[in-house]
From Swiss-Prot:
Residues 882-1071 are annotated as: Shikimate kinase. Pfam families: DHQ_synthase (PF01761), DHQS_C (PF24621), DHquinase_I (PF01487), EPSP_synthase (PF00275), SDH_C (PF18317), Shikimate_dh_N (PF08501), SKI (PF01202). It is found in: Cytoplasm. ATP binds at G886, M887, R888, A889, A890, G891, K892, S893. Residues 405-863 are annotated as: EPSP synthase. This is Pentafunctional AROM polypeptide. Binds 2 Zn(2+) ions per subunit. InterPro entries: 3-dehydroquinate_DH_AS, Aldolase_TIM, Aminoacid_DH-like_N_sf, DHQ_synth_AroB, DHQS/DOIS_N, DHQS_C, DHquinase_I, Enolpyruvate_Tfrase_dom. Its main location: cytoplasm. It comes from Eremothecium gossypii (strain ATCC 10895 / CBS 109.51 / FGSC 9923 / NRRL Y-1056) (Yeast). It comes from the Eukaryota. One of its GO terms (cellular component) is cytoplasm.
Amino acid sequence: MASVGLEKVNILGRDSIHVGYDLRAHIARTVFESCVSSTYVVVSDANVARVPYHEALCAALEEGLPARSRMLRYVVQPGETYKTRETKGEIEDFMLAEGCTRDTVVLAVGGGVIGDMVGFVAATFMRGVRFVQVPTSLLAMVDSSIGGKTAVDTPAGKNFIGSFWQPEFVFVDVKWLETLPRREFINGMAEVIKTACIWNAAEFMRLEMHASMFLQVVNSSKQVKVDTKGGPTSLSYTNITQILDHVFQLVLESIKVKAHVVSSDERESGLRNLLNFGHSIGHAYEALLTPQALHGECVSIGMVKEAELSRYLNILSPTQVARLTKVLSAYGLPTSVNEGWFRELTLGKRTPLEVLLRKMSIDKKNDGSNKKVVLLETIGKCYGTSAHVVSDTDLRFVLTDEALVYPFTDVRSSTGHTIVPPGSKSISNRALILAALGKGKCRIRNLLHSDDTKHMLEAVQQLNAATISWEDNGDTVVIDGHGGRTLTASDLPLYLGNAGTASRFLASVASLVCPEGNRDSVILTGNARMQERPIGPLVESLRLNGVRVDYLNREGSLPIKVHAESKFRGGRINLEASISSQYVSSILMCAPYAEEPVTLSLDGKPISELYIEMTIRMMEKFGIKVEKSNDELYTYHIPRGQYVNPAEYVIESDASSATYPLAFAALTGTTVTIPNIGHDSLQGDSRFACDVLKPMGCTVQQTATSTTVTGPEPGTLKPLEHVDMEPMTDAFLTACVVAAAAHSPESKCKNIITITGIANQRVKECNRILAMVTQLSKFGVTAEELPDGIQVHGVEQLSQLKVPDAVETYDDHRVAMSFSLLAGMVNYGQAPSSCRPIKILERRCTGKTWPGWWDVLHSRLGATLDGNEPLPEKENDIRKSVVLIGMRAAGKSTVGRWCAEALGYKLLDLDDEFQTYFGMGTVKEFVAQNGWESFRSKETDLFGHVLNKYSRSGYVISTGGGIVETASSRKLLQDFAATGGVVLHLYRDIDETIKFLRTDPTRPAYIEEVRGVWDRREKWYHLCSSYSFFSPHCSTTAEFEGLRRVFSKFIRRITGMLPVEVPVKRSTFVCLTFQNLLPEMERIKEAVYGCEAVEVRVDHLENYSQDFVLKQLTALRLATDSLPIVFTIRTKKQGGKFLDNDYSTLEDLLTVGLKAGVEFLDLELTLPSPIHQRILNKRYKTRIIGSHHDFSGEFSWEHPEWEHRYAQALAMQVDAIKFVATAKGFGDNLSLEEFRSKHTDKPLIAINMRECGKLSRVLNTILTPITSDVLPQAAAPGQLTLRQINELYASIGGLRPKKMFVVGSPIGHSRSPILHNTGYNSLGLPYTFDKFETDSAEIVKKSLLSREDLGGIAVTIPLKQDIMQYLDELTDSAKCIGAVNTIIPKKDGRFIGHNTDWLGIKNSLIANGVPEHVNTAGLIVGSGGTARAAAYAFHEMQCSTIYMINRTTSNLTELQKSFPQEFNIHVIESLEQIEQLSEPVGIAVSCVPSDKPLDDALSQKLSAFLSRPSATNFIPTILDAAYKPLVTPVLKLASEVHGWRPVSGAQMLVHQGVAQFEIWTGFKAPFAPVYDAVTQE
């Protein structure tokens, strides 16, 4: 173990900061010698108090305590939630009660919260007492404990009330860091890196050097069990002794910087605000992401953004930004809010641009409304001595990923520009490989600092190829190559992002590695696009040369696995080089290390031959000379040997990147010079100026080492008929945008510029040729693809360039940079402020080769830019497809049709598509001829194609049962699900499946038992799916239709078409505690009457297997007609049955609930935060209820525990909060209501248990848990039925008595009173429903509309139209139907007219097996008011055509005219018309009286319709609106003669009535008892 001494740091003229390791004795001695007092008060929080070292410190203090002194201890609850005025007051009350006086010394032992709050206590207690800081977190050690800032938080914001109060001493004992959790340790490193970054370049470099070892040690922290006074506890332990010197030094150096700055500016009037580097933007992020994101994590992101701002303003070099970003990442800190792990950690919270700017506007550094930010000049030095005012425009650009480019109109006022592009990516990557394989140190200057080279450097280190260090403040990389002798396999994959060059070069390097221990291979992988790019020809050549390489996913692309035991033999190697010259360069550079000399023979002329020449010339610089064969074309001889590194190697600027500023000059008529690229360049793209721009009318001056271009007047570039860009393929994109602006009336080529020799550009970061054609068309520029090139039609004048909605960049740096130029030529000549800018998406992709391109375009070339925030996609605008997976016979075909109909999607069966796409017969035929393996490969290719084409186009894609058999297809499924696509696993009972498959001759036979196939695939189905749905065996038509109805609602809910919302009105859910729901279905149907949801207590189930739980959930949906489910697992500590510490099973079950698409999921707030994080991140459409139960009665409603839990729930972004306490007296109900009234940020379910807590259940507003008389017992003490709640609520005035009426004449036989009164009685509502017979609407107005107790009116004939004149507003249905059957009184005295007849029709049909969206024709018999309601209902059910027949057609013609044209109503007059119809009719409604026989002509028409064949996916169904008798003549004819399903008008009556019931009362009517009451005579 390293040893460190004690260091004292001076601040404000005193050596009061003491830094060391294990300072217990020193602290005690110093405090008692220097701070003499009668009372010492040690304040810490509960987390710190349980650390053994805290007890050891207190013991040392007790031991050294002077004889006449005493020591008191006070422990507060941990966390920012308790950093309040209330907690401060409690500490002060304690000190007053203990008789503390002005000589008291307070010791704050803890993190920043304790230091801030206890310091504020010391500042105000007895008008100020002495205090000592003992910081226990890294953040507190280097930041909050230094400088004397003290404060508490308020509801208005953090640290709003406090003071400056300097501590007597700050004892920084780094031993505390041993028990600091890993994330907190890393969190503190942000402040450490910040101080080095702004003040101490040498320390910054030291931090860079030690990052790897630091993270290795901190990541190795482990949980240990320790005994404390409070009992055994678990703590994080990090063995910092391994890095003690480094940790001590980083703490000390950071403190020195802050102490120096504070001493110069104690009250933060100038210099001290430099310490806020990263904080202006970081604090804004923190305000939105707290508490999931820690302070240091947000400051880390803020530092990167503020460094990028400094670069954007031409103050900081790109190299310095890259260093800062790299070191932050190296210490485990986030550098962007979009990093995957950080987004997951922060629950995907959004950080809207305008909110960030608003948060920044309240920064204390600001100058009024002007935002001020600390800018960086270089690592170790700030720009100026205080923060600088920056514009919102510049901030917007830095904070967003979309660039807005304004016309380049104003740039011509500037003089010539000298631009030095970053180092060449091609040369940088080659130099790194050669230097790493070479022997000795090589200083590489002007290296490109980009994503590509970053991945290459990391890979070189990971393979132990070289030792890497930096000089010249990070501008020079020093590669100490090991000569190829130390290359060893890696146990971690080499992740290469989308770095194609690195992947190809490293594939050959990997063939040279040696195994070591368990490490016997190298895996190369990358991002999704990288895994599509080709590497096949290179791999094939390596394989033929003895290297064992496996593809781990798609054949021909990464990831690949290179086995270390195989050898790169050498000898003659044949290579196909028409796709990429990088294959050739890769083998060339590694060839000297083969076992024998290499002869590399290329199969024909290689693409981009100049890049091969570049490689050969560079190899010679490093000591290996390649000889070209004199006898064979494109053949090279490479001797064995070892590279000898030159002392220095200077990378040329990237010639491809240089084309952008040169093209800028060409387009704008300005002058640009590139000072380090000329005609002697290694790079083919150096010819761009002479070969492309000069013939187009530019003035070009090129020397051996520099290139200058001056453009003609804007709009006068001349077209170039043809250019072969094979030597400079990457520059073709720049040529395209210049060509788009070229025009000449004398041109022989008709302004069509042909570019060839660029076929390889189709397999770069994207298909660049197609990308250019597609994006140019958005500007109004015509372009066509050629087999090896592109043709671009230049516009006749710049004013013809159009403004595109947005430019897609395809995550391709060259696409983005090219179109940033053309964008500036749109509306050229107009003032930028008067024009709509061009939006360029994903602008940060330029970081691959030129991270500072936008900065150069803005600050050096003078372009006007702004930033734009991508708008979140509206779910309604996205038709994200649904993929169905599951075993054969799982119902994918049937359910697929249901799914497509419910969503209005198209259905695509992958097996049918296979036959069409490949033209090789059916799947069964193909398998018989070619075997399963060949089929699986083809299936994967097809599936990838289908997803690419249809994933956002509204398709239901039904796959074969074995789609999960291949890793490639599983990856496609997982990626689709990860981006929000629905992958739905359908399954049935496996025994039923086996039984069915044994009798199905249409499918290719399995070569193994079905159960074995299921056992193998089951885990894959779970892994790949985002949702699961269990389909039970249906033995009757009714069961089948019930399942269809349930599935339709399920699929619409999980896709967001039927959103699930937390109720905003009084609502309840019934609690089910059965061990098995299946035997209790009838009881459950009755138990849910009047409820908005049903809770299944999963902890009570007899079996926790996924299969059992999913079967229970489907059964519950079927029993309750898809009532929303509350999925609850209650642990024992929270009053349930589930084991408290079985977190793995609990999380698995919660995931089952989410994948089952439950509408609500109860998530206990006491569960470990990682479980919270994972569940919240995959909540999909499920609403989360954050719950906390106090069964022990430990906490009153005034206790801070509830405040803490409420803040926790808000921070977790749950959708509703549920708090359950235990009432000890009636007054607890009043305390609860006081709490409820103050906590309104989220919907709150808050109740007390026990008898004396019943009132709280009555007063609770939303989702009150209830029991039912039909259940065996209540789920919790004091639980009430819905009827009891309503009766009690009414008795205390919560529900006022109301009167409802049916009006019209005659109404003597009306069943409405019995319908509604049955519902009121069942639910305990204080309402009555009576008849009010009249044929005068005016009497209704005078007698009823003026009543204060009026709750609603049902209107029947003859008043449905007459009453409308007295109403204030009509619903859309009432307007369209032209009649009102429901009057709704509003609180403001207005009356709304509604029509529920159409709902009665629609819901009656749906209840009898008709889907919500029929997608077929409908038939209406009759022409009265009910016929109009039927027409409206049919339109809402998406009937394609509505046919109408009647005894007299004149009435129908008038009715047809009164409806909108989109209803597509057709009046049928004759039988001949019916015979000519081809469209099937699936639903019908009879609206003619049932007390008289049908007219013969009408009866014939009806029979003609009913006898036509029906091609619907459901039984054709007819409703007779007449409800007496139950079976009318029309229903008898339809069912008995023509096989239609009959639906009685009594159902329509009840359905329209329960719709009224819900509108008037807010409660769901109990359908079954209401229906029974209505239909019984």
